[in-house]
């Protein structure tokens, strides 16, 4: 992941999508 630490960052992306 270019922005951070793989799955942890993907989870953050999901959180933003659900927000």
From Swiss-Prot:
Hemolymph. Composed of 3 major subunits (IB, II and III) and 1 minor subunit (IA) which form homohexamers and heterohexamers. May also form larger structures. Signal peptide: none annotated. The keyword Ribosomal protein does not apply. It is found in: Secreted, Extracellular space. Keywords: Copper, Oxygen transport, Secreted, Transport. Hemocyanins are copper-containing oxygen carriers occurring freely dissolved in the hemolymph of many mollusks and arthropods. This is Hemocyanin subunit III. Belongs to the tyrosinase family. Hemocyanin subfamily. GO terms for cellular component: extracellular region. The keyword Kinase does not apply. One of its GO terms (molecular function) is oxygen carrier activity.
């Amino acid at each position: 992941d270019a922005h951070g630490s793989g799955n942890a960052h993907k989870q953050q992306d999901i959180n933003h999508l659900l927000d």
